[in-house]
């Protein structure tokens, strides 16, 4: 099979035409014009991975009014599964050079270089114009892809930032609620111990790190105040017991003026059971306060 036959083989496989969804201008990327001694070169690149669209693209170039008066429409195409071929259209060796550009740039689709002949033979330099315009059209396609990739990356990053900001805002609100509840607990304990209360603070605008530190500080404060309240209750109870013991001791001493039976009947006598009962009441009140604190948390 000679070279000319190999160029035309793909176009003669009888693939049925599909309906194009875009015009030639919409589906292709065009290079800048190169003019040399009145000959003008222009290339188009149509990205595609579907070989069934090849006859459609070739027909679009064939019937384009903008290319009606050009002298050559050199073509090459490359698709997955090693489907590739070219057509010189009278400019010998040009199709192979276009196919080499597709391979080197590692893209799939069709590249077409058109030439308006200016009347002078250009020699080998014409191949530079052919390959340069072809590469330029592919570069434009890659540039658009890169821009789209950057936009997609930016959209993704923006979405992640929004999600992160939303999570961070939610966490900040949670910390503020926790610290506000802790402040109420601290003030309840301080009030019971006759201590000055914490001043009301607006925690909005503080960083998460600061809020975490404040939350840890409030937890330590509550633990310390609880211990102090329990210790105070124990001391109060012990004082009451000592007071009772002192009264019992004084009652046993001699020469104590004993009131008459009538008068003594009006005097309430404190017994160990009475003092214990009163201390128990105080202890229950302290326990209730601690339980209320735990509920506040």
From Swiss-Prot:
The keyword Coiled coil applies. Residues 228-250, 280-297 have a biased composition (Basic and acidic residues). Residues 225-255 form a coiled coil. Pfam families: UPF0029 (PF01205). One of its GO terms (biological process) is regulation of cytoplasmic translational initiation in response to stress. The keyword Protein biosynthesis does not apply. Residues 228-297 are annotated as: Disordered. One of its GO terms (cellular component) is site of double-strand break. Belongs to the IMPACT family. This is IMPACT family member C14C8.09c.
């Amino acid at each position: 099979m000679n070279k000319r036959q190999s160029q035309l083989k793909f176009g003669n496989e009888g693939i049925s035409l599909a309906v194009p969804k875009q015009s030639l201008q919409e589906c292709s990327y065009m290079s800048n014009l190169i003019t040399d001694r009145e000959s003008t070169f222009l290339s188009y690149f149509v990205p595609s991975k579907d070989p069934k669209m090849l006859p459609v693209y070739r027909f679009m170039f064939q019937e384009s009014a903008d290319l009606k008066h050009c002298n050559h429409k050199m073509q090459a195409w490359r698709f997955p599964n090693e489907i590739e071929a070219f057509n010189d259209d009278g400019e010998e060796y040009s199709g192979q050079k276009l196919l080499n550009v597709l391979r080197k740039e590692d893209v799939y689709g069709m590249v077409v270089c058109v030439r308006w002949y200016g009347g002078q033979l250009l020699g080998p330099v014409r191949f530079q114009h052919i390959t340069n315009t072809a590469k330029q059209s592919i570069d434009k396609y890659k540039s658009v892809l890169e821009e789209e990739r950057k936009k997609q990356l930016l959209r993704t990053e923006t979405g992640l930032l929004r999600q992160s900001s939303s999570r961070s805002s939610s966490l900040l609100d949670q910390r503020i609620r926790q610290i506000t509840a802790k402040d109420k607990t601290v003030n309840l304990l301080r009030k019971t111990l006759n201590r000055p209360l914490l001043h009301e603070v607006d925690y909005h605008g503080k960083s998460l790190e600061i809020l975490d530190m404040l939350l840890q500080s409030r937890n330590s404060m509550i633990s310390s105040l609880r211990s102090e309240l329990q210790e105070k209750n124990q001391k109060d109870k012990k004082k009451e017991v000592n007071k009772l013991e002192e009264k019992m001791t004084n009652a046993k001493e001699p020469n104590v003026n004993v009131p008459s039976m009538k008068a003594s009947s009006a005097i309430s006598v404190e017994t160990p059971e009475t003092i214990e009962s009163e201390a128990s009441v105080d202890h229950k009140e302290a326990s209730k306060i601690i339980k209320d604190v735990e509920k506040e948390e």
